[in-house]
């Protein structure tokens, strides 16, 4: 499982029934850890004095937890982009000098927007390699706060990183977002969690967030399960030929603040019915087929970019033409996801095209398929979203499948429990 050159060959089940164990939400887990650590610091207590419950066990969350708990002089976050952004802001307001670094790919993921904003607030941050990219040396101290303006169309994680430290700033924070604001549900999730822990934080207008100086409250935080991870089971339900297929997904709830809960709406157009239930006091979702798929899907993913690979893969397998917009952040994710999708679907004979630099378009064009395994580019969502395509391409092979540990460590075991056969 740890061999970089491992390849899994997948054979789908004839019937799709059962209960699927989902990981806890990575987005909520990482925010809960940072807020909990800041709450403890405000009371001169050690970080992680009170641990959130049902914490995600994915790589991103584990490296964040270890960094907050141990605070080593050199923090290596591996490929965890969320950890890089959130911890950079956290370290800027935390006494001590730390170096934060990661994989070679991480050293090519831009962070200048966040660093520049933190410097405006008084942070002492030095680039140790190429200007604008990790690794960083962060010398933490009390920051004054004030007014900062950053682009709203780059990454909502820059916004969330700044917002979460804002209650610790002497003068609070007025954060102005320029241009189109992408992934707004993730910003709303951050603000909601901050308020749950006692912060005075909210939108002052359509493009400005105001956070007043006020210590966080220490709180036992229970984390719900992950809608992003549920999307791959929606994909499986959409693609299976089992008309009586039924999956139970515990730990998902109606009214979730997670942006990727939009998956239930999108997949209602791709043949999947979502039923909310409560069994023995636990909220959950039951998936069934509704046998209603649109003839074409046009959609703007500006608020849920992490669903793009799942929906592109599903539409390609079902032969549904599409035009998808709002994908500008996909080029700075774990890989260039737009190019990765284009190259890997071509191996399956699907010729998607890129328009306007970031739009993905497919009108049914085909190309000559190859027998090469699907490459994952060290990107968990490539492996996660392509695996259910074995319903359409039995025997589909995926290279470097262990990348799923970044967000869904037990994915392959859950696939096997659901009846998929996995051959190495």
Segments and roles (model prediction):
Residues 1-424:
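Short, structured segments at the rim of ligand-binding sites
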């Amino acid at each position: 499982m740890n061999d970089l050159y491992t390849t899994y060959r997948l054979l789908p089940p004839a019937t799709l029934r059962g209960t699927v164990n989902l990981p806890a939400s990575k987005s909520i887990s990482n925010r809960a850890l940072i807020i909990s650590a800041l709450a403890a610091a405000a009371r001169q207590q050690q970080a992680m004095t009170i641990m959130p419950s049902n914490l995600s066990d994915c790589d991103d969350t584990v490296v964040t937890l270890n960094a907050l708990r141990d605070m080593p002089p050199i923090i290596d976050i591996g490929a965890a982009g969320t950890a890089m952004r959130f911890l950079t802001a956290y370290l800027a307001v935390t006494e001590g000098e730390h170096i934060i670094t990661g994989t070679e790919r991480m050293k090519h993921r831009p962070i200048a927007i966040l660093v520049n904003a933190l410097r405006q607030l008084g942070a002492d941050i030095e680039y140790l390699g190429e200007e604008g990219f990790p690794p960083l040396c962060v010398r933490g101290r009390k920051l004054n706060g004030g007014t900062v303006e950053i682009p709203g169309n780059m990454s909502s994680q820059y916004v969330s990183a700044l917002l979460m430290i804002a209650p610790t700033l002497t003068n609070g924070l007025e954060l102005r977002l320029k241009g189109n604001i992408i992934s707004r549900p993730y910003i709303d999730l951050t603000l909601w969690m901050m308020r749950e822990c006692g912060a005075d934080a909210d939108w002052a207008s359509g493009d400005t967030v105001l956070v007043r100086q006020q210590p966080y409250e220490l709180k036992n935080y229970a984390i719900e399960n992950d809608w992003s991870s549920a999307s791959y089971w929606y994909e499986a339900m959409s693609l299976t030929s089992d008309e009586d297929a039924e999956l139970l997904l515990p730990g998902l709830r109606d009214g979730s603040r997670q942006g990727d809960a939009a998956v239930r709406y999108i997949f209602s157009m791709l043949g999947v019915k979502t039923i909310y239930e409560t069994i023995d006091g636990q909220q959950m979702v039951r998936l069934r087929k509704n046998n209603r798929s649109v003839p074409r899907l046009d959609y703007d993913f500006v608020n849920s970019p992490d669903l793009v690979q799942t929906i592109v893969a599903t539409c390609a397998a079902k032969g549904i033409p599409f035009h998808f917009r709002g994908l500008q952040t996909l080029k700075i994710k774990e890989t260039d996801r737009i190019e990765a999708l284009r190259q890997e679907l071509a191996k399956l004979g699907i010729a998607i095209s890129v328009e306007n630099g970031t739009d993905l378009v497919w009108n049914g064009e085909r190309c000559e398929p190859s027998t090469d395994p699907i490459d994952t580019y060290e990107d968990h969502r490539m492996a996660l979203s392509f695996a259910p395509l074995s319903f359409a391409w039995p025997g589909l092979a995926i290279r470097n499948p262990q990348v799923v540990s970044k967000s869904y460590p037990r994915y392959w075991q859950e696939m096997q429990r659901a009846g998929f056969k996995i051959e190495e």
